[in-house]
């Protein structure tokens, strides 16, 4: 059973990664209306080879991979619930994974049938990364990563725990601003990075405001992440799980900044934009894992005593 769970959890992560990629691809290529206003089929029927368009194919494939991923997520949640029922985080994570998967699908359906609001569609991406993060956490528990890094002896102080919780919430909000950039079609609102002609110019449109707000949010995220990394290496260097996680998070945020800048300089190159979406999804999942470790800190302290 354990071997099956390991293989299944990896396959589920791969499936959900494809879903995240697919959602970003739908947005980047303007394929959201590729299947008309019917759901789950395309214009009320299966796609026929005689009338396939790139937009229709992308949208239909996204719906199909979402359906397949739903099966993987539900099976993983049920098996983890049964096999790891003695772990206190298992049931909440399984519920979150399935619940947010359903919400994500319903929001996608609503956007197709009743039209798309950029602010709601930006939240659609936010829902998907919560589902993704919960699946990653279940997989890490299945692979017993805690034992490999001796995380069971990890004790965090209040300052670090609060910073990790707050940073994770803030990262989610920063992700929302990035998704809003895509859905408001503001990617090239300010075509020079970080500012136009090297200096700040007052925005004069909604797209300008959205783009500037995202860049400021991203800058704050980088600074905050550097601060938390400094805290970890100053006070918690003996815990490999923390130092490794923070180094990995710095790598993710550096790649995120680079792909963000390149997105502007390349006129929103499709592959760079997709990488930009995937990297922040993985960073959010990593921060959620740190939140999981922080939530165990008190019980670890009591057990060690």
Curated annotation (Swiss-Prot):
Matching entries from InterPro entries are given as: COX15/CtaA_fam (IPR003780), COX15/CtaA_HemeA_synthase (IPR050450), HemeA_Synthase_type1 (IPR023755)
Name the GO cellular-component terms: plasma membrane
Per the UniProt entry, the Enzyme Commission number(s) are 1.17.99.9
Q: Which domain of life is it from?
A: Bacteria
- TM helices/strands, residue ranges: 7-27, 64-84, 93-113, 123-143, 161-181, 213-233, 241-261, 272-292
State the active site: 59
The residues listed in the UniProt record as binding heme o, with positions renumbered to this chain, are 62, 124
Q: Which reaction does it catalyse?
A: Fe(II)-heme o + 2 A + H2O = Fe(II)-heme a + 2 AH2
Give the main localization category: membrane
Q: Which cysteines are disulphide-bonded?
A: 35-42
Q: Which Pfam families match?
A: COX15-CtaA
Cofactor(s) listed:
heme b
Provide the family line.
Belongs to the COX15/CtaA family. Type 1 subfamily.
Q: What is this protein called?
A: Heme A synthase
Q: Which organism is it from?
A: Listeria welshimeri serovar 6b (strain ATCC 35897 / DSM 20650 / CCUG 15529 / CIP 8149 / NCTC 11857 / SLCC 5334 / V8)
Question: Lineage of this protein's species?
Answer: Bacteria, Bacillati, Bacillota, Bacilli, Bacillales
Instruction: State which gene encodes it.
Output: ctaA
């Amino acid at each position: 059973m354990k071997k099956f769970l390991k293989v299944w959890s990896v396959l589920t992560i791969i499936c959900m990664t494809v879903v995240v990629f697919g959602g970003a691809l739908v947005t980047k290529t303007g394929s959201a209306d590729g299947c008309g206003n019917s759901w789950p089929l395309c214009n009320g029927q299966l796609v026929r080879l005689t009338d396939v368009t790139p937009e229709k194919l992308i949208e239909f494939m996204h719906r199909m991979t979402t359906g397949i991923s739903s099966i993987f997520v539900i099976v993983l949640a049920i098996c983890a619930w049964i096999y790891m029922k003695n772990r206190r985080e298992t049931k909440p994570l399984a519920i979150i994974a399935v619940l947010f998967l359903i919400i994500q699908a319903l929001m996608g359906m609503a956007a197709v049938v009743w039209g798309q609001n950029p602010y709601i569609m930006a939240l659609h991406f936010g829902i998907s990364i919560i589902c993704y993060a919960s699946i990653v956490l279940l997989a890490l528990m299945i692979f017993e990563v805690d034992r490999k890094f001796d995380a069971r002896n990890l004790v965090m102080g209040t300052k670090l725990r609060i910073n990790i919780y707050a940073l994770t919430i803030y990262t989610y909000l920063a992700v929302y601003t990035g998704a809003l950039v895509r859905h408001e079609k503001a990617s090239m609102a300010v075509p020079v990075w970080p500012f136009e002609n090297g200096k700040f110019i007052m925005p004069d449109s909604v797209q300008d405001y959205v783009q500037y707000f995202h860049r400021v949010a991203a800058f704050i995220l980088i600074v905050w992440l550097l601060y938390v990394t400094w805290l970890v290496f100053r006070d918690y260097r003996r815990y490999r799980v923390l130092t490794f996680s923070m180094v990995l998070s710095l790598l993710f945020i550096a790649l995120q900044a680079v792909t963000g800048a390149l997105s502007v300089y390349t006129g929103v190159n499709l592959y760079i934009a997709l990488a930009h979406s995937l990297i922040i999804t993985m960073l959010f999942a990593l921060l959620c894992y740190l939140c999981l470790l922080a939530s165990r800190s008190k019980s670890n302290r009591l057990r060690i005593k």
